[in-house]
Protein backbone atom coordinates (compact mmCIF):
# COMPACT_ATOMS: atom_id res chain seq x y z
CA UNK A 1 0.00 0.00 0.00
CA UNK A 2 0.99 3.57 -0.48
CA UNK A 3 1.35 6.29 2.19
CA UNK A 4 -2.10 7.69 2.75
CA UNK A 5 -3.90 4.73 1.15
CA UNK A 6 -4.56 3.41 -2.33
CA UNK A 7 -3.47 5.23 -5.49
CA UNK A 8 -6.44 6.44 -7.53
CA UNK A 9 -6.03 7.22 -11.21
CA UNK A 10 -7.90 9.93 -13.11
CA UNK A 11 -7.65 11.34 -16.63
CA UNK A 12 -8.41 14.92 -17.52
CA UNK A 13 -9.67 15.96 -20.95
CA UNK A 14 -6.89 17.95 -22.61
CA UNK A 15 -9.37 20.49 -24.07
CA UNK A 16 -11.88 21.02 -21.24
CA UNK A 17 -9.58 19.97 -18.38
CA UNK A 18 -12.55 18.12 -16.88
CA UNK A 19 -12.09 14.64 -15.40
CA UNK A 20 -13.46 12.02 -17.79
CA UNK A 21 -16.10 9.47 -16.84
CA UNK A 22 -17.55 6.28 -18.38
CA UNK A 23 -15.95 4.39 -21.27
CA UNK A 24 -13.08 6.27 -22.89
CA UNK A 25 -10.56 5.59 -25.66
CA UNK A 26 -7.33 7.29 -24.68
CA UNK A 27 -4.19 6.89 -26.77
CA UNK A 28 -5.80 3.98 -28.63
CA UNK A 29 -6.62 2.03 -25.44
CA UNK A 30 -10.04 1.50 -23.88
CA UNK A 31 -10.58 2.49 -20.26
CA UNK A 32 -13.57 2.66 -17.92
CA UNK A 33 -13.96 5.40 -15.30
CA UNK A 34 -16.55 5.44 -12.50
CA UNK A 35 -17.01 8.64 -10.52
CA UNK A 36 -14.12 9.90 -12.68
CA UNK A 37 -11.78 7.24 -11.23
CA UNK A 38 -10.12 4.59 -13.41
CA UNK A 39 -11.67 1.17 -12.66
CA UNK A 40 -10.71 -0.87 -15.74
CA UNK A 41 -7.85 -0.75 -18.19
CA UNK A 42 -7.48 -2.44 -21.57
CA UNK A 43 -6.69 -6.18 -21.68
CA UNK A 44 -4.82 -6.61 -24.96
CA UNK A 45 -4.04 -9.87 -26.76
CA UNK A 46 -0.64 -9.56 -28.45
CA UNK A 47 0.19 -11.09 -31.86
CA UNK A 48 1.85 -14.06 -30.08
CA UNK A 49 -1.32 -14.72 -28.05
CA UNK A 50 0.01 -13.35 -24.75
CA UNK A 51 -2.12 -10.98 -22.69
CA UNK A 52 -0.88 -7.56 -21.63
CA UNK A 53 -2.82 -5.05 -19.55
CA UNK A 54 -2.75 -1.30 -20.18
CA UNK A 55 -3.44 0.48 -16.90
CA UNK A 56 -3.25 4.26 -16.49
CA UNK A 57 -1.05 4.71 -19.56
CA UNK A 58 1.50 1.98 -18.74
CA UNK A 59 1.72 -1.77 -19.24
CA UNK A 60 1.07 -3.62 -15.98
CA UNK A 61 4.22 -5.33 -14.70
CA UNK A 62 4.91 -7.41 -11.58
CA UNK A 63 1.44 -6.73 -10.26
CA UNK A 64 -1.98 -8.31 -9.72
CA UNK A 65 -5.12 -6.92 -11.38
CA UNK A 66 -8.73 -8.04 -11.12
CA UNK A 67 -10.40 -7.71 -14.51
CA UNK A 68 -14.08 -8.55 -14.97
CA UNK A 69 -13.97 -10.62 -11.77
CA UNK A 70 -10.88 -12.63 -12.76
CA UNK A 71 -7.47 -12.22 -11.10
CA UNK A 72 -4.36 -11.97 -13.28
CA UNK A 73 -0.69 -11.54 -12.45
CA UNK A 74 1.38 -9.60 -14.97
CA UNK A 75 5.03 -10.63 -15.05
CA UNK A 76 8.06 -8.38 -15.55
CA UNK A 77 7.79 -9.26 -19.27
CA UNK A 78 4.25 -7.69 -19.18
CA UNK A 79 2.73 -11.11 -20.04
CA UNK A 80 -0.10 -12.48 -17.90
CA UNK A 81 1.26 -15.51 -16.03
CA UNK A 82 0.07 -18.90 -17.32
CA UNK A 83 0.44 -22.42 -15.95
CA UNK A 84 2.53 -22.68 -12.78
CA UNK A 85 4.27 -19.41 -11.96
CA UNK A 86 6.42 -18.90 -8.87
CA UNK A 87 6.79 -15.66 -6.94
CA UNK A 88 8.84 -14.84 -3.88
CA UNK A 89 6.48 -13.65 -1.17
CA UNK A 90 8.17 -12.61 2.07
CA UNK A 91 11.21 -14.80 1.35
CA UNK A 92 9.09 -17.86 0.45
CA UNK A 93 8.65 -19.13 -3.09
CA UNK A 94 4.91 -19.52 -3.76
CA UNK A 95 3.79 -21.25 -6.96
CA UNK A 96 0.44 -20.01 -8.25
CA UNK A 97 -1.56 -21.88 -10.89
CA UNK A 98 -3.08 -19.97 -13.81
CA UNK A 99 -5.29 -21.02 -16.71
CA UNK A 100 -4.07 -20.95 -20.31
CA UNK A 101 -5.90 -17.60 -20.53
CA UNK A 102 -3.90 -16.19 -17.61
CA UNK A 103 -6.65 -16.31 -14.96
CA UNK A 104 -5.51 -17.36 -11.46
CA UNK A 105 -7.33 -20.58 -10.55
CA UNK A 106 -7.87 -19.45 -6.95
CA UNK A 107 -10.87 -21.74 -6.39
CA UNK A 108 -9.22 -24.84 -7.86
CA UNK A 109 -8.24 -27.67 -5.54
CA UNK A 110 -7.20 -30.94 -7.11
CA UNK A 111 -4.70 -32.55 -9.46
CA UNK A 112 -3.11 -30.18 -11.98
CA UNK A 113 -1.16 -31.48 -14.97
CA UNK A 114 1.80 -29.54 -16.32
CA UNK A 115 3.77 -31.21 -19.09
CA UNK A 116 4.55 -34.78 -18.05
CA UNK A 117 4.06 -34.01 -14.33
CA UNK A 118 0.97 -33.84 -12.11
CA UNK A 119 0.83 -31.79 -8.90
CA UNK A 120 -1.51 -31.26 -5.96
CA UNK A 121 -3.00 -27.76 -5.93
CA UNK A 122 -4.96 -26.15 -3.09
CA UNK A 123 -6.91 -22.96 -3.75
CA UNK A 124 -4.82 -22.15 -6.81
CA UNK A 125 -1.44 -22.68 -5.12
CA UNK A 126 0.79 -25.67 -5.83
CA UNK A 127 1.61 -27.66 -2.70
CA UNK A 128 5.35 -28.42 -2.80
CA UNK A 129 5.19 -31.64 -0.76
CA UNK A 130 1.68 -32.80 0.10
CA UNK A 131 2.58 -36.49 0.53
CA UNK A 132 -0.43 -38.82 0.58
CA UNK A 133 -3.73 -37.30 -0.54
CA UNK A 134 -7.21 -38.83 -0.73
CA UNK A 135 -9.10 -37.30 -3.65
CA UNK A 136 -12.29 -38.34 -5.44
CA UNK A 137 -12.20 -41.89 -4.07
CA UNK A 138 -8.48 -42.61 -4.62
CA UNK A 139 -5.20 -42.21 -2.79
CA UNK A 140 -2.38 -40.38 -4.58
CA UNK A 141 1.16 -39.74 -3.43
CA UNK A 142 3.14 -36.63 -4.24
CA UNK A 143 6.82 -37.08 -3.47
CA UNK A 144 9.21 -34.40 -2.30
CA UNK A 145 11.08 -34.03 -5.57
CA UNK A 146 12.09 -35.45 -8.93
CA UNK A 147 15.40 -33.72 -9.59
CA UNK A 148 14.60 -30.02 -9.38
CA UNK A 149 10.83 -30.55 -9.72
CA UNK A 150 9.12 -30.22 -6.31
CA UNK A 151 6.00 -32.21 -5.40
CA UNK A 152 5.32 -34.40 -8.45
CA UNK A 153 2.78 -37.22 -8.34
CA UNK A 154 4.10 -40.79 -8.16
CA UNK A 155 2.89 -42.85 -11.14
CA UNK A 156 3.28 -46.39 -12.47
CA UNK A 157 5.61 -47.68 -9.74
CA UNK A 158 5.98 -49.01 -6.21
CA UNK A 159 6.96 -46.23 -3.83
CA UNK A 160 7.64 -45.88 -0.10
CA UNK A 161 5.18 -43.34 1.28
CA UNK A 162 6.77 -41.68 4.29
CA UNK A 163 4.48 -38.63 4.51
CA UNK A 164 1.04 -40.18 4.96
CA UNK A 165 -0.77 -37.32 6.71
CA UNK A 166 -2.34 -39.86 9.09
CA UNK A 167 -4.31 -41.50 6.27
CA UNK A 168 -2.51 -44.88 6.62
CA UNK A 169 0.79 -46.30 7.83
CA UNK A 170 4.05 -45.48 6.07
CA UNK A 171 4.94 -48.37 3.75
CA UNK A 172 5.59 -49.30 0.14
CA UNK A 173 2.51 -49.03 -2.05
CA UNK A 174 1.89 -49.57 -5.74
CA UNK A 175 0.52 -46.77 -7.96
CA UNK A 176 -0.96 -47.09 -11.46
CA UNK A 177 -0.26 -44.99 -14.56
CA UNK A 178 -2.80 -42.39 -13.38
CA UNK A 179 -1.11 -42.13 -9.98
CA UNK A 180 -3.86 -43.97 -8.08
CA UNK A 181 -2.81 -46.31 -5.27
CA UNK A 182 -3.78 -49.86 -6.26
CA UNK A 183 -2.70 -51.91 -3.21
Language model regions located:
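Extracellular adhesion/carbohydrate-binding repeat motifs centered on closely spaced tryptophans
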Residues: 1-183
